[in-house]
Every structure is written in structure tokens, then in C-alpha cells.
Amino acid sequence: MSQKFLFIDRDGTIIAEPPTDYQVDRLDKLALEPDVIPALLALQKADYKLVMITNQDGLGTSSFPQETFDPPHNLMMQILTSQGINFEQILICPHLPEDNCTCRKPKTALVESYLADGVMNSTNSYVIGDRETDLQLAENMGISGLRYQRDGLNWTQIAKQLTQRDRHAYVNRVTKETAIDVNVWLDREGGSKIKTGVGFFDHMLDQIATHGGFRMDIQVSGDLYIDDHHTVEDTALALGEAINIALGDKRGIGRFGFVLPMDECLARCALDISGRPHLEYKAEFNYQRVGDLSTEMVEHFFRSLSYAMACTLHLKTKGRNDHHRVESLFKVFGRTLRQAIRVEGNTLPSSKGVL
């Protein structure tokens, strides 16, 4: 999997840029931008690799001798390193604009190695800087740019924007029997819109979203003039696939077993988002239908869902009322799923290194 990178400007972004001569050439001119250290630490924790890229006009010439550049730069690096911030590379263009070099931002010579196929995750990599040239560099690299402003898009806001997850997936499934659109937002809650044509099934799916703490929109057109089999089965397959896609690389997610009593029912669920589909199911019903949903399709729903979601699922309910027994299964699954998809860190919860 390709890597996420942040290409970060120095003067005016990591450290303050002197407004008079725009050169940090003395120790007393060195000042970090507010909140840059906690922001960079948070971004590193979110698996971004850091690259510093800076234009230093005339560096090494009489107008900006190397010996005046080095002390504040080295102190800055010592401070950042001491706080656990590590830059993969420090890329410096020492030329003046009139030199017409190929490495001065917004030109891309300094970052050519990152533009090779498979090196950089271009969707989730950014240039961060305080000047228009930084945004132009981002455009030339084919990635997004963020314009840093101390009183606008500051480091706290940048860190929040780049680390706040919004896991989403869309699945369109069309067969001879059904046409299904599923949108899943694992980090949003409320506002789910569900219409399968089977009213009680809609109510059960809403239990998953409500108790799972996420939003899903499901629109189904199926062959209900025959029965509810294809509608329930294909919805489960599309929903399971959407959840699996939205989980992404699964870093930081938890695994959880949950017990939910409901009136006279006791439902148990254990869920492992393991990459290995399996269902253990135990539930008995007195009647063939609850509302307009076939009770035999409840097991089939969870079997299809666990297959498409690539999870190991144990479900069991006991009680007297069929409505409550069915509802308890969907609720307990939702509550367990809430725990399993919640992001609690950044490590992959597997000794195998893959889920």
C-alpha cells in the first residue's frame, strides 16, 4: 500500500518568517508557529510521513551565507527531533528566482522520487505551506494543498482536518432480481434513509444503524411479487460489502462481545472483523413471518452479511415473542458492531499484520 506524505514548507509554516528580510539567519529570529509540535505529532500518529521542502533564496551566497543559516535551522531540527517529530527528508532549494532552476517551488524536481508509481498515496497526501507557490506545488504534484494561516487554517485545524476520519463507502448491486444502492458512513450518526419495500425489514436495518452509531442509506427495488428472499439476501450482501470497504485498512478498530436483554429476550452477539466469514446462529421462532418479513430470512440475512463483510459472527437469542426475538438480534448486532468499528488508536489489531 502506498504511503501518505505531508510536504511541509518551513518559513511561515513551521517557524515564523521575519517580515523584514524573510531570512531566519540568527538564533533570536527563530520562533515556532503556534501548536506546530502537537499537530505534527498527531499527524505522525495518523501514519503521515513528513517531508520538509523550502526555498531559501541565495543560500550559500554572500546574501545568505550557509554559516548564518545553519545555527537556527539546526536548533529547529533539534527541538523537533527532541519532541519525537521526524522528517524523512529536508529538501532545500538554494537558488534565486532569476536562476531559473528546476528545483525551486512550485517546480517539482526536489520531489520527483515521490511521484513515481506506487510511492505516494496521492489521494491522502498534501502540501502544507503559507504561500501561493505551495498550492501551485501541490497542483503540479497532483495532490491537495493546504494554505497555512496562523489566524485562519492553523496547525490545530490542519491536524483535525487530516486526522478526523469520515469512513464512507457506496455499493451499487444490480441483478436480475434486485437493484440496490447502499451508502454507509461509519463516522456519522443519525439521518439514515432505508427503503427496501419490506417495512419490518426497514425497521430492523434501522436498528443496526441506530445501535451501531453510524448512518446508512439503503434503496432497494426487488422482486417482492415473488417473495422477500432476494431482497433480504442481496441487501445483506451489499450492506456487508459497503461496511467492509468503509472500514478501509482497519487500523485502530476494536473487537467486542455484547449481551443485550430485551423484555423477556436475551440476545448474545460476538463479532470478530477477522477477514474470515463465518456464522454461528441459534434462534427459534413460532411463526413464519413477523410483519411482512419471513423469519427464516433472518438467519439468511446474517449469513449473507457475515460473508460479504468478511467477519466471524456468533448470534443467539432466547425469548417468547417473535417480534422481540428478531429485533433483539438486530439490536445486539448493532451494539456489537458499534464497538468493533470504533477507532481506538492507530495500530492494526492483528498479530498477522493484516485483517
From Swiss-Prot:
Zn(2+) binds at residues 93, 95, 101, 103. GO terms for molecular function: histidinol-phosphatase activity; imidazoleglycerol-phosphate dehydratase activity; metal ion binding. Keywords: Amino-acid biosynthesis, Cytoplasm, Histidine biosynthesis, Hydrolase, Lyase, Magnesium, Metal-binding, Multifunctional enzyme, Zinc. This is Histidine biosynthesis bifunctional protein HisB. The gene is hisB. Pathway: Amino-acid biosynthesis; L-histidine biosynthesis; L-histidine from 5-phospho-alpha-D-ribose 1-diphosphate: step 6/9; Amino-acid biosynthesis; L-histidine biosynthesis; L-histidine from 5-phospho-alpha-D-ribose 1-diphosphate: step 8/9. Its EC number is 3.1.3.15, 4.2.1.19. In the N-terminal section; belongs to the histidinol-phosphatase family. The keyword Lyase applies. Its cofactor is Mg(2+); Zn(2+). It comes from Yersinia pestis. It holds the Pfam family Hydrolase_like.
